[in-house]
Every structure is written in C-alpha cells, then in structure tokens.
Amino acid sequence: MESLTKTEYVDAFLSNYSPNDSMSIFRQRLEQVRLDNDMLSQWIRERMDIERQYSDQLHKLAMNMQEKNNSSFAFNYAWKQLEGETLEISRYHSQIIGQIASQVYKPLIDYYTSSPQTATLRRLAERLSTVAEEMASSSVPGLKGLKKKGRDADTKSQNDLTASRATWDSDAPLAFEKLQIVDEERLLILKQVYLTIASLETDTALKQQEFFSKSMAVYSDLPIEGEIRQFMNSTSKVMSSASANKPSKSSGFHINNGKSKEEKSHGENESGGKLKNKMSTLFRRKTIMPKKDKKPSHKSNGRPNKLTAFFNKNSKASSISSAEEHPSNIDDSSIERRHYDSNHSSQIRDHPSTNNNASSYQNFNETSDEGEDNDATIRANNVRSSFLEAPLPVQPNVQAETVTPKISSKASPFNKPNSVHSEASRNTPSSIDRENASHSNPIMMHGNDFGGNFNNMQSRSTTTSPTSAVASPAPTENEDSNAAIERVANTLRKNPTISRRTRRAGTMDRYATASSDYMESNLGSLPNLSTLSLQSGPDSTATWHPEFPNSSGLSASIVEKYSGELSEDGLLHPSCSGHIFMKYTSDFNTPPPEMGVRVASEFPMSFTHLNDHAVKYGPSENTLSLIPELLLSPIKVTDFNLHLDSINGASCIPLTVVQKWKHDESSSSMIAFVKPNPVWRNLGSSLHIEKLVIIVYLGENVLVKSCQSSPAGEFSRKTSKLKLHLSNINISSSGFKILAKFAISPSAAIRKPVIEFRIRMVDSSNNPGLTKLFLKPDMFDTTSSSGGSQLESAYEETKVPTSYGIHVRECSVFADMS
C-alpha cells in the first residue's frame, strides 16, 4: 500500500503541476473503480446463487441415495452423475477465479503501477525526497510551521503561481499534506475493495470444499462388500487363466515355479508334506528358497547341489584372481560364463530395454526411497558375507535339481557340448578382457530375471575354497527330519542377518520377479496376487531434471517440496522446502557483470545452501546478486524453506483422497477414491502428474501376510506396505478408484490405516508457485539517488520467466476409525 500511495502522490503533480486538476482526474478514476467493484460483486453473487442451486441438487441426491436400498442401487450410475456435478462446479470455480483476476486485480495493478512520463517522475521524486529531508531536519515541530511558511509564500506569489519553479518548490509541502488528507478516504475505499474481493474468494473456496465433502459423503455410506466380492471373482478368473497358459519364450530367462500335479502326487508322502510345512515355517522371514523346475535333473548324486552353489558365491574380483592363480579350479560353469560374456551382443539385441529400465528404476529409487536404499545395501552386504561363512543345507527327500534357463538368442552358450567347453578352456581370455566384457555387458552383472542372476551366482561359486563347501554337508536321504530342522535352525541362529529377500548384485532394483512379460504389461491390467514376492511395473521415467522456459536472458526453475498430514480441514503441520535453478541465455549481447534478483513470497522465507561461486546475498532482504557469465549453463542457485500455516495448507496439495475401510479378524479391505483437489490453485479439466506413488499400510505393528490390489502394485511382507507406482497419468475431475485387501494374522495390534502420497509434477501455468522471482535493476544503478530508486522499484520490477516443479513427499492421510 505504501508504494501505491507514493505513486498517487506522483500522479497528482503530472498535469501542469496543478493539484486541482489532478484531484478531479483522481476522483473520476476512483468512481470508475467503485462502479467496477459493484458490477463484480453483482456478477459473483449471481454465480454463487447458481452454485447454491447445485449444492441443493447434490444434497437431494444424497438424501435419495440414503432412502433407497443400497443393494439395488446402481453404483456406476451414481458415480457418473457425481462426475458431471463435480465437473460443473469446478468449471464455475475456474470462471470465478479467472474473472476476479482479469476484472479486478489486473486493472488495479495496471493503473497503480503505470508510469507514462518516466523522466518527469524521476525529477519529481528527487524534489519530494529533498522536501522530506528538509521536513526531517527542520526544528519546527511537524507540519504546523510548514503550513505557515507555505501560506505566506502563497500570498506573495498569487499572480505567477506556475511561472516560477522555486515558488512551486516552496508550495510542494502544502500540496503534499493536502494529498495525505484526501488519500485517507482513498485508502479506506481501496481497503474495502480488497477486503470484499478477498472475502468473496475465500467464500468461494469454502463453498467448493463444502460441495466436495457433501458429494463424497454420498459414498461414505455405500457398502463395499459387493465391490470386493466382484474384485475377488475377477482376480480368481485371472489367476486361473494365467496358470493355464505357458510362459512365453520371448521374455528371456524363465523359472517354472512349482511341480506338476502328477509329480506332487507321486513325489511327496505324508512325512515329506509335514517336513515341507515345518521347513517353510522355519524359513519364514529368514531366507529365500529357490523355486523348483518342472523337469528334474538326472544328475542327482546326493552331493551339495544348487543351494550350496548359491550360498557359497564369491565376489567377481575374487573369482577372477583365483582363476588366474589356480587354473585347475576352472570348470564348466565358469567356462559357460565366459561364453556368455563373449556372446552378450545377441542378448542385448533381444532385450534393448533392459539397461534403460534398470537405470531408470535405479534413479527413481534414489529419489523416492533414499532412506530405504542405504539400509538395504547394508543388509545385502551382510547377506553376502554370511552366505560365505556358513551355507544352508537342502531339504531332505527332495532330489537335487538344476535350473535350466531358457535363452532366446540364436547361439545359446549353455547348450554347447562338453567338447566345446574343453576347447574353450584352452583359449582362456586374459583378466583384462574379462573385465572389459563385464563392464560393457550390464546384463551379465544384473541379469534379466532371477534365472540370469542365479546362473551368475553359480559361476562365481566355482572358485570357493573346499573347506566352505564341507563346513555344512548336505543331509542324506535317510537323515531324520528333526535333525535336519535342528541343523538349519543352528545355522540361522549363527547368521541372524540372513534376509528373506536380497537385492540384485550391483543394481538398485527392488526385488527379482519371475516373469518379465508381466513387467512389460500395463500396470493396471492385472491385480497383484503375490504373497511371497513383489510384482513391480516398469519405470520409464528417467531422473528428473529442472525444466526452463524458452526465453532469452535470465530464466529460472523452482522446485517446491511439500509435506504434511492431509485431512478434511486442509494440510495439517505443512512444510515446504525448495530449490531455485537459474540459467542465463545471451542473445548475441554481452551479459551484464551483475544482476539483482528479489525472491518474493507470501510466507516467511529463509535461504540455505547458497552457491557461493555464482551468487551472493543482496543489500536488502530476500535479494540475491548474480553473475550472468557463470549461469550460461543451468545451475542450482540456492535452497529455501517456507514457513507455512495450516490456513493455506489446503491449496498446496493437488490431490485429495476419500477412503473407507472394513476390518475383520483376519483381513482388512479398503476402497478409496483419488481425485484432484478442487481448491488447488490450477484446477482444470484434468491434472497431469509425471509420477505418483501411493503407499498404503495398516499401522506400525500390524503384520500382513498377503495383499491383493487393483490396480496392481508392489507389496512387501517385510514392511507390510503396498506401493502403487503410476507414471505420466492424466487424472480427470472424477478421479480413479483403488481397491485393496490385506490378509493379516489375528493379533492384538491396533490397526491405524495410513495412505501416503509422493507426487512429482511440472506445472506450466503462469503463476502456480508460492515463490516468485523479480529482477531488481536498482541494486546496481548508481546514477539515480537512493530515494528515486526506492520509488521506481514499485513499478519497474519485471518477473523472471519461471517453470515450476511440484514434489509432494510423505503426505499422510489417516483413516477415520470412528
């Protein structure tokens, strides 16, 4: 307001330095502002009446739905009707906000920040600053002496008022006081205009939130038993059809999980079944058991088989060095690996997307699960060291089987005869060639699935010392089952770090999955029915980089990260931190030596991690001094923290959720609707989100045995959490539906369901963020005086073109258990 009043003082002296003419012009413009305000208020009242009618219709719809029988009510019809009503309300909301911005804010800003005669204003600003200094240094108390002095000068120079500039300078303080008196009325009217607009906008936002809560309250009374029953029927059909089909050969390596019915009927007796149940109970949440192949091998000689080879694996460097020193230890499996290295080009042709998927998934895990990755890496290292110390035995009464991975390449190195192996052993490549091959072939290190990874582990285990293989001999067929269980229990007690799931060597992938066909399918096509492993979809989005607008000169990219607890009242305990990236694009001109930038925000701000190489703090608050020559490539300038309040927290999160839970003794079922937030700042017909991760869990101490969900996602028995990954999606105003069912062990733990959001999006609208950047040319302008530069900064600041990225981390939604 202070800058606007100073502008009015300047505008009053423009026309022939006559205060009377300027006052008449000012009164005319003020009447026009009053008229525009009345028209806008009438227009908003009409639209609020229309929205009130829509709210009444929604209330009638809710009452009718409560009166009808829930079992006979058509769920899809009600959802379509609600979608139409919500879309209509959001359209009116967008029109009201746009009309307020175009009819009120923009004319006021254009009027009060215009400078038609810049040179005259600069001269007048210097005079006014001189008068202000005289008023401050004068010993006469206040304006009383200046009034007297001005009246005496007015009586002496009545004939030539506009002829002498010195006379006008002596008259300036009196005119200044007159403007102050008249300006009080203008300030009151302006304050009334702004308060009216702000109250109307707040009422509109509250109405929208009330309409949304009313419309969603309709579905809080709907039973979900029918939906879950229909979901269970569809999932059982999908599983029956999936088990009848054979796995495709074009997906690389495959492992056939389980035996056929005939083998199970003939190969397992009663004691074997009991032993298998005991072993599965013993190994639960401790270690992983490799799946069995349908075709058993004929080379079962009772010796340590694939389990000992799997658990006695060494690192790649130790296998290479031992192979160099002891060439007699090289057997057929290591030769197979070398053939696999030499023929890796065919594998890369068949699987071109393997490297991209691995790298992109690694990048996303670094951004979304930073805390989990460090713990998991330590656990994986502990697992490898513990496996080398004490291998685990094999179940008795089960024949030793070997995994026969299927390879879709033309010349498979695993199907060559022994003569080829012996011939290749004579032509062993050097260690340098093997290192080059291993670095150039990421498939050899990571594998396309569990089969490829397991084969690499076998090849590494060939050079282990014979003492490690004899340390825990495999049980014979006649060994007692209780003795075998006791042996395994002792081994597990000695190695408490053995985990049920281990990460792949050298990758940040979540967990191994048995089929790559499912990974290439759509994320929402099949439900997740896995209880022992995780099904993860592809992560096609690479590491996110800041986007800059296409403009010459200085441009910026601001990434804002929000967190808090989402509730019906908005975002509780909100917090916002962000990064500011800048870039200077020169259009064949020499960039200036320094530039000033002001960071503006409605909330208190603090800078952290300032880049001292290219940026310094400015002379005033929230200002930065930049060196454009060092910003020719994008660089992160600084980090910042915003201190938010819960009043404006509702407009920070672009998504909201409505959920309903049903809890039984052994299960918990959920139905949730994820929709765009109607009070968010940039709500349109649809909302584009670059990456969305939804995490659902029942509480801290609730152990979940299995989970079924639609759409499909990842479920971890270790953390008892369900994760849904969605990339590059457009969410309409009606939103989408999530179904989930958790099977739990009956316990006394209290279930407190929580849904967490992690959102990443890039907003291309003009003014979406909480922080804005303005150029400040007066920071390095030494020609004008200090008073003039302060006055000019009110209307000479220009906004820096900026692209905004929005990240939401750890935004929790707690279920209402009442």
UniProtKB/Swiss-Prot annotation:
One of its GO terms (biological process) is clathrin-dependent endocytosis. Residues 283-301 have a biased composition (Basic residues). Residues 551-807 form the MHD domain. The modification Phosphothreonine is found at residue 463. Residues 259-273, 323-352 have a biased composition (Basic and acidic residues). Belongs to the SYP1 family. Coiled coil: none annotated. InterPro entries: AH/BAR_dom_sf, F_BAR, FCH_dom, MHD, Muniscin_C, Syp1-like_MHD. Pfam families: FCH, muHD. Residues 7-269 form the F-BAR domain. Keywords: Cell cycle, Coiled coil, Cytoplasm, Cytoskeleton, Endocytosis, Phosphoprotein. The gene is syp1. This is Cytoskeletal protein syp1.
